[in-house]
Amino acid sequence: MKKYVYMFPEGNGKMRELLGGKGANLAEMTGLGMPVPQGFTITTEACTRYYEDGKTIYPDIQDQILLYLDQLEKITGKTLGDPEKPLLVSVRSGARASMPGRMDTILNLGMNDEICEAVAKLTNNPRFARDSYRRFIQMFSDVVMELPKSSFEQFIDQVKDKKGVKLDNELDADDMSELIVLFKDHYKKSLGEDFPQDPKKQLMEAVRAVFRSWDNPRANTYRRMNDIPHSWGTAVNVQSMVFGNMGETSGTGVAFTRNPATGEKKLYGEFLMNAQGEDVVAGIRTPQPISALADTMPEVYQQFVDISSRLEKHYGDMQDMEFTIENGKLYMLQTRNGKRTAQAALKVAVDLVDEGVCTKEQAVMKVEAKQLDALLHPTFDPAALKAATPITTGLPASPGAACGAVYFTADDAAKAHKTGIKAVLVRQETSPEDIDGMAVSEGIMTARGGMTSHAAVVARGMGTCCVAGVNGIKVSEEDKTLTFADGTVVHEGDIISLDGSTGNVYLGAIATQEAELTGDFGRFMGWADEIRTLHVRTNGDTPRDATQARKFGAEGIGLCRTEHMFFEPARIKAVREMIISDTLEQRKAALAKILPMQRGDFEAIYRAMGGLPVTIRLLDPPLHEFLPHEDDEIKELADEMGVSFDKLKGKVESLHEFNPMLGTRGCRLDVLYPEIAEMQTEAIVSAAINVWKEDGLHITPEIMVPLVSEVNELRFVKKVIKAKADELIEQSGLKMKYMVGTMIETPRAAVTAGDVAKEAEFFSFGTNDLTQMTYGFSRDDVGRILETYFDKKILESDPFARLDQNGVGRLIRFAVAEGKRTRPDIKLGICGEHGGDLSSVEFCHNVGLNYVSCSPFRVPIARLAAAQARVKELGLA
């Protein structure tokens, strides 16, 4: 029989795929002899089978769960549902990739009316027992029965108001009894049934709920954001409870071995006495810094410091740990590699190498490539910041600078983002349901919560600026107002600025400045460049793009789109003259006006790149894109160009196509109008000649013909290019070389790549169009169906954002092999937006491409992703 359940001592840290990250680490800590409450893990395979079996836990798996429950009961000497020696357990999810706050947890399972009173007598602590029971009712109702946790808060507030207290821990045993009655009554009125009293039924329902939570909206959103496949599933950890809410010698906390915001080598975290785990992250009470534990419980603190040091050394990385103290005894509930900001990730990686803890190869694996994005964007201008006065200060939960319009709900922030408005999400406290709005916000501010609250952890993971726990503010979601302590009121849509590095909050917008990449960044990226074999170029159309990309380490331009230069007001007129020309002579006259403009552009780009390779694509879009379509715009242009309205309108209509993206564009334009290819070739080659002569930069122009489907198209256009290029080079007296290649962006070009390589000296895979044509999706319209496809598990990711390796990737593999067979020295690259996607970069490395090309700000990301792909290939991670 297949094994679906493992006791903690049966596992180890290498079993992440089966036991999930939490289960594997609990097993590893158990093996290291650390104080871990005993338990068992239900595997990820049980979760995937749950979905395969129509969201059912089949009897064979249920039997194994009960068998291992029996083992746990023997180990602990306690029994689930036994009032004399009651066992209470926690039920927690644990995927192989960390998903903090995205799935569901239940504490104190096994509680019922009888057990509650038994625990009260056994512990001589009725308040603790009843507090644990009311928490369980609330969590079980939320996670298992989908009765919102927030719907119970009104009863807590009601009892606190009646008693005249502000904090939950000021309620006594009688108050807890009252809450239990209110909670159970609310449960029955809402669901039409009594709260379940059978602990084994509670357990099975809880396991089912954790499996179900793998597919809840916030988990799905997080998985899509972090490239975690649905097929992985989650494990479930069932662990004997230890209690931080038994009194003033009990407590709970979360800590990191280093500061997750800065990377400083110093124990960092928070704890609460007389509390359970969710109290710390929920932000309901303000926790104490971990250093204060040294005064409160010095022996426990020293034991925790020693364990923290051992764990970091063992895992070779910064650890994020959860712990509970029960009646003065320390228990470790979790350890995992800690989520951290980009700045912290760099510092930790560099410091670990300097400390001799890890190698350079291991260090480059400790920074998520996409995190670098947070380092490449502007920060507040120091002069502007100095002139500004903060209206309040909170906790600097996640660094960075954010400026935007205030919104009070995640939905409103998401709607604002869709209309192009930069939003700052302001909440009393965030919850996992806010993930969609948090993901698109420039910054996040909360009234409650500490440095390990939900808002802080999620913001750091996303690289989003966050200021948490801002005391003295009043957030009214209903009135859509934010009131500061001095009485200042900010309404929805008003602008505020957040400094996540200091916790300062400012009214209005503060000027920003470009990021500076020095210090740890330079060293770290130097290691990445030493390791990687895949080159990284940029997609750039202007000298500014080129300069920015070189600053970020680009090794050339993989795609320069010539048409983007045509839309400037001074040039568009000449382009339009060329389009409406009736004769070849008229068209050539118009092209002669465009030639010096294009040549000047290319000279500036060549100079900016300092002799690095530059691939220039010939004109690609259909001609109608350069003409107006509304009658009033056509009339205005006709008057400006001195032609009749009817003539111009007729030309516009003649160029109209039902499916222009599959119409007269790319190389088809050059076949119909060879003079366009001739003019562009002259601009490209003459610019290279001028820069060679004037600056001494030996340029090898790379001329790329777009949208080839048939080798004869390329052969025809190449003949036009060669005739003009050879003529210009001969006249120059230089021994300049050039290359002619093509974009592989149609399926036919991919499957006939062996023939195409007879004419092409290089291939650049245009994966945007190749994806569009392989799927038959319109890139501009596919968004309408993607959410439905995600929800129905038809697709796991957007194929225009992450390369489809099974379909489009198979075409690329085939084209690479066929191209190399025909021309062994063919140069191979990719220039679609996939060039900056992590998994796509790894794919490009593995299939043997020479380079990837991406937007300037994604160049460092691609450099690191290429290094990580190489480390994986060498098995040095």
Residue positions per predicted region:
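Nucleotide/phosphate-binding sheet-loop regions of phosphoryl- and nucleotidyl-transfer enzymes
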Residues: 1-388, 411-415, 421-424, 431-436, ...
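Short, compositionally biased
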Residues: 356, 506-525
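Short beta->alpha connector loops at strand-helix junctions that form conserved
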Residues: 40, 447-449, 468-471, 560, ...
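Short alpha-helix capping/helix-loop boundary micro-motifs
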Residues: 310, 480-486
